[in-house]
Curated annotation (Swiss-Prot):
GO cellular component: large ribosomal subunit
Stored Gene3D superfamilies: Single helix bin
PANTHER family: 50S RIBOSOMAL PROTEIN L32, LARGE RIBOSOMAL SUBUNIT PROTEIN BL32
Family matches, as Pfam families: Ribosomal_L32p
Protein name per UniProt: Large ribosomal subunit protein bL32
Protein's organism: Myxococcus xanthus (strain DK1622)
Lineage: Bacteria, Pseudomonadati, Myxococcota, Myxococcia, Myxococcales
Domain of life: Bacteria
Record's compositionally biased regions (Basic residues): 1-18
Amino acid sequence: MGVPKKRTSKMRRDRRRAANNNLRSAVQVTKCPNCKEPVMPHRACTSCGQYKGREVVAQAEA
């Protein structure tokens, strides 16, 4: 089994871990075409319950 000959410094360790931070992207938000509320892509709207022009979540009438 391979064993490291030298201890990994904090700087080298942190630099290696920081390399993956730029791969994460910010959360995408679009507008619902029906009610214009912000909604995440490929998900039903939480305010009107529609997805791709169809009502997929029944909303309670107030």
